Amino acid sequence: SLVGSEMCIRDSTETVLTRWVDPTPFVPGDPKRRAERCELILKMQADGLAKRLEHAHAKTAVIGISGGLDSCLALLVAVRAMKQLGRPTTDVLAVTMPCFGTTKRTRSNAEILCDELHVSFTEIDIANTVHSHFADIGQDESVLDVTFENGQARVRTLELMDTANRTGGLVVGTGDLSELALGWATYNGDHMSMYGVNAGVPKTLVRHLVRYEADIAATTELKNVLLDILDTPVSPELLPAKNGEIAQKTEDLVGPYELHDFYLYYVLRFGFGPAKIFRLAKAAFAGRAEYPDEVLYKWLRNFYWRFFAQQFKRSCLPDGPKIGSVTLSPRGDWRMPSDAAAALWLAELEQLFPHEG
């Protein structure tokens, strides 16, 4: 057939890739340029938050602190914003809300971080509130399902929102661009805030921003806690801890963020199709034993499936600063119906690995 002939011609004349494909397109490879980029991004985030705090006449910036990477970055940005405004860093109110999955490591790191940054700190143990909420809705607490997890996230958002009202402040969102792409957030839970400072920053870049802050840290204690946060597995900590250790690791569930950020970059920045992105990924991650073709395919398929299925969360995002050329704000660069289907993209992938579909 004509289609078959075209396929044969395209296959036999496929251009050999000779250029280097960067596996981390969001992160500059040169250390000096990377440090300059990190400082610029942190300033952009702080500028955006400072403007919103001024415009809203907010007395406080309220942030839920988990001891994890994203909330750490949001806190660092909030401290910069307050300093920029000439206000005391105690106007940043960090709230830690331990529950069933909180570990000693993340809890301790949250406290040390807040102490070193000289912000106001409070702890709200949400366990009793969650128990009461589960009783209200008839949730069996022995069933560790989506309700068990999302219930905790929504209680945390409730506590933050009302704390902001009580203190005349606004809630600073912590979720990043990679989480928005994958829909890795609880709808109307950590998905919601009053201003999301990390919404334009992909996870691979979040790590480098925090590492940059560690490199320029004013004290050894601050540097050490930032490095330990960087070394902590990414986790929402919504399932009960096992022997005091994190039981739920995000990248085991949704896939490696370095792959998803690579896919995200070429989907949004260039609009490339699945086959082309898969080929670029093979070139970028060649020689990485943990990423054979089957694994690259698996997580690319997972990316498309989640990206389409989770658009409804991105259709109602809080405001936040635009950081780079790739963004998912429904008020900026990204227009996508929540009912869009991934069928065509998944069908193209199926042609690459028919046995994997």
What spans do the regions from the language model cover?
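ATP/NTP-dependent adenylation/nucleotidyl-transfer catalytic domains that generate, transfer
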Residues: 5-6, 10-67, 71-357
